[in-house]
Amino acid sequence: MMMMGDSFGSIGSSMASLFFLWATIQQIFPDHLKITIKEFLLSSFQQLCFAQRVSDHFTNLFSPYVEIHFPESDEYSFNQAFSAIDTYLDSKATDKTKHLRGSQVKESKGLVLKRNEAKVRDEYKGANVWWERVVDNDGNRYYKLTFHNRARTLITNSYIKYVVEEGKSIIVKNKQTRLFTNNLSTQWVFGQNMWRSIEFEHPASFQTLAMDPKKKEEIVNDLIAFSNGKEYYKKIGKAWKRGYLLYGPPGTGKSTMISAMANLLNYNIYDLELTAVKNNSELKKLLTATSSKSIIVIEDIDCSADFTSNRIKKESNSRERYGKEDKDENSVTLSGLLNFIDGIWSACGQERIVVFTTNHLEKLDPALIRRGRMDMHIELSYCTYEAFKILAKNYLDLDGDDAHPLFSEIKALLEETKISPADVAENLMARNQQIDVDKSLNLLISALEEENQYQRSQQEKKKSKFKIFG
């Protein structure tokens, strides 16, 4: 009993000392030092024999400061407030912090300065606040905002809203389009790190895209109408999203079209690799981790998974075996993808575009590409004369039907030869940075004649086979 009494006496003495020291600190030190000293005293107090919970109650009882945490991610999605706060605090770097880090943006002569400190002090309408970037034991990141209780109304009703809105406006102003690709789920960390990204610097634009000008204008108008359609989609009661199906032979510009879309709208691109997704649950999580103002792309969807028109036939021919496989979690199903596109979970974000590409439209399951799901079907076909003129302007600075005497010969060859815009561009591209118009056009004519001869020979072979088996 005596030992216990001595123990409590020692603890009581320590607490009394801490109370006295804290009262002295309140009178002597400025606010920005009080936070640091308070944390030191609390850590010292927590080393006493009292449990952590008692220490926390003590802190809440006697501390005049309030804390608010802003986690990087919620259960199913990224916390947009976190990135806005992070951007806002970075904008204060040169004014509020002494430790900075510099980085150089590509193709820029200047340096971008960012803070290299976890703690930042800010002031708002006479109230002092302290921000701290924290990583907990599980690797989760969050911002901790600390302020005096007397400023609670000002901070919660006005300051936080100001910080988030200011951060979002800076993000929009300085936005750099990024290209994302999904990581394997084994690389995910507590619901984070689902996507990795790089800066997107593809120069494609609709002005340089080799396709029929009228079709191009129709696509551009549709994209702009969508990006400005927030109130319209709200009025008709539909999620603010749109689907585009790009189909055609290889080399006809499907990937370039996606790049031009992103550059026109300043949207991020999420290149979804379905073969890296185990099941529908993972697909749903990946969707909720994408941002608004984005293009979600599944290229060569006929090769990504079994979403072809033969899917139903395969299922009916293997019911006995399929009974076991139906429970296999390591697969993305058609219903899971359809829910991804336009199910309930597809409305978890705004201003999203979904793009499918395929070389074989006839192979896809009709349910996947029906109108309303893929709102616009865009055929990217072989190079036409109109597309050639755009390429000639891009590569050779030749503009108009009468820009060169060889144009009429090229026009005639294009009308009877199937060749992709990529192959045409390859023949027009300057060698050794030297543009030789006549040489480039003659190279193209030779390539067209060779391809035309090959295609005719293939047609003759087919005719002869038909006669034999006929």
From Swiss-Prot:
Any one Gene Ontology molecular-function term assigned to this protein's record: ATP hydrolysis activity
Signal sequence residues: 1-30
Protein name from the UniProt record: AAA-ATPase At5g40000
Family assignment from sequence similarity:
Belongs to the AAA ATPase family. BCS1 subfamily.
Q: Where does ATP bind?
A: 248-255
The record lists the membrane-crossing segments as: none
GO CC, alphabetical: plasma membrane
The record's section on CDD domains has: RecA-like_BCS1
Instruction: Give the Enzyme Commission number.
Output: 3.6.1.-
Query: Where does the source fall among the domains of life?
Result: Eukaryota
Q: Which SMART domains match?
A: AAA (SM00382)
Please give the cofactor(s) recorded in the UniProt entry for this protein. Answer: Mg(2+)
Q: For this protein, what reaction is catalysed?
A: ATP + H2O = ADP + phosphate + H(+)
Q: Which InterPro entries match?
A: AAA+_ATPase, AAA_N_dom, ATPase_AAA_core, ATPase_AAA_CS, Mitochondrial_chaperone_BCS1, P-loop_NTPase
Q: Print the keywords alphabetically.
A: ATP-binding, Hydrolase, Magnesium, Nucleotide-binding, Signal
Native species: Arabidopsis thaliana
Query: Which GO annotations describe the biological process of this protein?
Result: response to stress
